[in-house]
Amino acid sequence: MKSRLFIISQYLLPHHLLSRLAGCVAECRARWFKNAFTAWFAKRYQVNMSEALVEDLSAYEHFNAFFTRALKPGARPLDETPGAILCPADGAVSQLGPIEHGRIFQAKGHGYSALELLGGDPALAAPFMGGEFATIYLSPKDYHRVHMPLAGTLREMVYVPGRLFSVNQTTAENVPELFARNERVVCLFDTERGPMAVVLVGAMIVASIETVWAGLVTPPKRELKTFRYDEASRAPIHLEKGAELGRFKLGSTAIVLFGPEQVKWAESLGAGSAVRMGEMLAVPAQA
């Protein structure tokens, strides 16, 4: 009954209004408020500040600065296995596996369209049909920067407007097409394993999504917008394996997609597996 009421509330609540209000709270610089709220949050979610570059909670100018905190050098060593594809973020594996008939598995019989996830462009989605996906959920206590699984050159970024349902196990099991309905940013790279998509999915009270090349990704009008980076007039944007790609200001989910016969997921991973950025996520499926 409790879960059902929660799901009903997800359809009734004003997602974007609540998220804008949360964004204002998270950017508040009043010392008495930001210090008290940050301390409460760190204690409530048992945030490990010993690995943070700045351990003093009161040193952060606002809550968002704390939430997107940098880590000390070496806190997330990169797996050195030759050809390893790295986990892009701290969190837990929600699901991973093949993209079958253009569908990505969500939970308990729910799936969603890879085409819709990527913004509805058949040409952009085509290389991933029959490929592989991995969905990583970032919890409140996690490090909320997203990094490159492989070295890649940015080809395209797509902002896809949408709802802002909460993202957790309950909504994954009860909200159809959850990740293809929520607001998201699709980042498409060319890599040694072919096209790679990293999708940053928003959620309720996720105030914003940033990338290292574009900053805050919030078009003036909430409509689908494509940014191309492979034009001759632009200097190429190349990111090395393990380099920061973007960050969540109040996190959510990162989804990584590869084409067919390109990667094989690490045998130790499955739904529910705890992961850290820089650990092995997959290996090449072929030499």
Curated annotation (Swiss-Prot):
<dbReference type="GO" id="GO:0005886">
    <property type="term" value="C:plasma membrane"/>
</dbReference>
<comment type="function">
    <text>Catalyzes the formation of phosphatidylethanolamine (PtdEtn) from phosphatidylserine (PtdSer).</text>
</comment>
<keyword id="KW-0670">Pyruvate</keyword>
<keyword id="KW-1003">Cell membrane</keyword>
<dbReference type="InterPro" id="IPR033178">
    <property type="entry name" value="PSD_type1_pro"/>
</dbReference>
<feature type="active site" description="Schiff-base intermediate with substrate; via pyruvic acid; for decarboxylase activity">
    <location>
        <position position="252"/>
    </location>
</feature>
<keyword id="KW-0443">Lipid metabolism</keyword>
<keyword id="KW-0210">Decarboxylase</keyword>
<feature type="active site" description="Charge relay system; for autoendoproteolytic cleavage activity">
    <location>
        <position position="252"/>
    </location>
</feature>
<protein>
    <recommendedName>
        <fullName>Phosphatidylserine decarboxylase proenzyme</fullName>
        <ecNumber>4.1.1.65</ecNumber>
    </recommendedName>
</protein>
<dbReference type="InterPro" id="IPR003817">
    <property type="entry name" value="PS_Dcarbxylase"/>
</dbReference>
<feature type="modified residue" description="Pyruvic acid (Ser); by autocatalysis">
    <location>
        <position position="252"/>
    </location>
</feature>
<keyword id="KW-0444">Lipid biosynthesis</keyword>
<comment type="similarity">
    <text>Belongs to the phosphatidylserine decarboxylase family. PSD-B subfamily. Prokaryotic type I sub-subfamily.</text>
</comment>
<dbReference type="InterPro" id="IPR033177">
    <property type="entry name" value="PSD-B"/>
</dbReference>
<dbReference type="GO" id="GO:0004609">
    <property type="term" value="F:phosphatidylserine decarboxylase activity"/>
</dbReference>
<keyword id="KW-0865">Zymogen</keyword>
<feature type="site" description="Cleavage (non-hydrolytic); by autocatalysis">
    <location>
        <begin position="251"/>
        <end position="252"/>
    </location>
</feature>
<keyword id="KW-0472">Membrane</keyword>
<feature type="active site" description="Charge relay system; for autoendoproteolytic cleavage activity">
    <location>
        <position position="90"/>
    </location>
</feature>
<comment type="subunit">
    <text>Heterodimer of a large membrane-associated beta subunit and a small pyruvoyl-containing alpha subunit.</text>
</comment>
<dbReference type="Pfam" id="PF02666">
    <property type="entry name" value="PS_Dcarbxylase"/>
</dbReference>
<comment type="pathway">
    <text>Phospholipid metabolism; phosphatidylethanolamine biosynthesis; phosphatidylethanolamine from CDP-diacylglycerol: step 2/2.</text>
</comment>
<keyword id="KW-1208">Phospholipid metabolism</keyword>
<keyword id="KW-0456">Lyase</keyword>
<dbReference type="GO" id="GO:0006646">
    <property type="term" value="P:phosphatidylethanolamine biosynthetic process"/>
</dbReference>
<keyword id="KW-0594">Phospholipid biosynthesis</keyword>
<feature type="active site" description="Charge relay system; for autoendoproteolytic cleavage activity">
    <location>
        <position position="147"/>
    </location>
</feature>
